[in-house]
Design a protein with these regions (language model features):
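TPR-repeat structural position
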Residues: 76-77, 104, 159, 197-200, ...
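Structural motif corresponding to the intra-repeat A-B loop/turn of tetratricopeptide repeats
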Residues: 73-74, 101, 156, 195-197, ...
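Amphipathic alpha-helical segments of tetratricopeptide repeats
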Residues: 167-172, 208-216, 249-257, 293-305, ...
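Flexible inter-repeat linkers and adjacent short helices
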Residues: 1-230, 407, 411-419
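TPR/TPR-like (Sel1-like) alpha-helical repeat modules
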Residues: 85-89, 109-117, 288-297, 336-343, ...
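Structural signature of alpha-solenoid helical repeat scaffolds
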Residues: 137, 175-176, 219, 259, ...
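Conserved alpha-helical positions within TPR/SEL1-like repeat arrays
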Residues: 144-155, 180-196, 222-237, 262-277, ...
Length: 419
């Protein structure tokens, strides 16, 4: 059953716009504030309501939805100023844009069966500390009540309870508002992963079901991209990189760095990590390393040392490692850049806070310096790394560093014999 067929079963014939909105309401799927603005009833707004239900922005906004249009354009002050009516829908929409104004008690009463949405909005924007409880709310309204309660449960550490609430929310609205149900499935996947402390098959199933529900929601590209990224990360952590990679690519096709910079950067960084860890079975697979290098460079246009230190350091380190092994006609230049990248990472990898992480960077940097023939500097880095590995009992790492040091000794002996 589609959103359109459900909507058409309830004719929208309140032309003056003073009555309550026609259900199902297109709420909850788009992000705040647009996602909670009610659509005034009337023949002039019906096409827009159906578009929003399907996850699409209207190509033409009716005059009575000027506030919605202005919100989409990013002018919330103008949107608030456009809501001059005293009918319940206009007052509710003003409350969404300015929760500090108005009288919630009167508004709640005037909205009738939709009154609980006042409490949903108040909780969602942080005005109310507790979520509403309304067992009589149905459909998409009841789903949003349960979603608010799930958010509260997660904040209290009750991930299992949140999963149950979100599953119940999906059941309430999947027949009438499938796009909202898809968004809630994605939220349930996140709660399930938090409950299990790992991405289970159930997490992946929920995310892929959410993506199917969002497939035609053309103007919810950020939500679709976020869901693809979440699915990719879950599959990647399960070791199924072959299935994770298409999700990362899909996430990148949907958004730009300007629209969703952190989603875009994360998709690039994790796509690179997937390519770098995937087994290489044929010569053409080496091209993946070059793609990984480009993706990491892209991620680092968003991740900065000041604003995203953890992600920045990870991308820097992976880029350095990629440059070492990437096939190139400028291999020496790549190695020099890798040494510099390692040095920048070492500046934020404290010996006290992350001794083993720092030691691994030192070992990698020492190895590259050795390949560049800078043996004395390389040995200093490698000795430092070996000391930490020995202290923490990492026998394999100690053996690897000793192997590099032995090779340096052989190369230095060879140089002396040639002199």
């Amino acid at each position: 059953m589609t959103a359109e067929t459900v909507a058409l079963s309830a004719p929208n014939d309140s032309a003056d716009g003073t009555g309550l909105p026609v259900r199902p309401l297109p709420i909850g799927a788009f992000p705040l504030p647009l996602g909670y603005l009610l659509v005034p009833a009337g023949a002039d707004t019906e096409a827009a309501r159906l578009d929003l239900l399907a996850g699409r922005l209207p190509t033409t906004w009716p005059d009575r939805m000027a506030a919605h249009r202005l919100v989409v354009e990013g002018d919330q002050d103008a949107a608030l100023a456009a809501l001059t009516g005293d009918d319940p829908v206009s007052r509710f929409n003003r409350f969404v844009l300015d929760p500090a104004g108005g009288t919630p008690e009167t508004l709640r009463a005037d909205l009738g069966e939709l009154g609980v949405l006042v409490d949903v909005v108040a909780f969602t924007v942080g005005v109310a500390a507790e979520p509403p409880v309304d067992g009589a709310a149905t459909g998409e309204v009841g789903a949003l009540v349960l979603c608010a309660r799930a958010t509260h449960a997660l904040a209290d550490g009750d991930a299992a309870g949140a999963v149950d609430l979100l599953d119940a929310a999906v059941s309430l609205c999947e027949g009438s508002t499938p796009v909202l149900a898809a968004v809630l499935r994605g939220a349930a996947a996140g709660a399930e992963q938090q409950r299990a402390a790992t991405p289970t098959d159930g997490v992946v199933d929920r995310l892929e079901a959410a993506l199917r529900g969002l497939d035609e929601a053309r103007d919810m590209r950020v939500a679709r991209s976020e869901t693809h990224l979440a699915a990719g990360l879950a599959l990647h952590e399960q070791g199924r990189t072959d299935r994770a990679i298409p999700h990362y690519h899909a996430a990148l096709r949907l958004v730009t760095s300007a629209e969703a910079p952190l989603v875009w950067a994360s998709a690039h960084a994790n796509l690179a990590a997937a390519y770098l860890t995937a087994p290489m079975t044929q010569a053409s697979d080496q091209l993946r390393t070059g793609i990984a290098v480009q993706s990491l460079r892209s991620a680092l246009t968003v991740y900065t040392r000041a604003d995203h230190p953890t992600e920045w350091a990870s991308a820097q380190l992976n880029l350095a490692n990629s440059l070492v092994y990437s096939p190139s006609t400028h291999q020496a230049d790549n190695l020099v850049e890798a040494v510099e990248l390692y040095e920048e990472v070492l500046e934020v990898r404290s010996r006290d806070e992350d001794p083993m992480g720092r030691a691994r960077v030192l070992a990698n940097q020492g190895n590259v310096l050795a390949h560049l023939g800078m043996f004395d500097v390389a040995k200093a880095k490698l000795y430092d790394a070996r000391f930490v590995f020995e202290e923490f009992g990492d026998v394999e790492a100690v053996r690897t560093v000793r192997g590099v040091l032995d090779e340096i000794a052989r190369q230095q002996a060879l140089r002396r014999s040639e002199d």
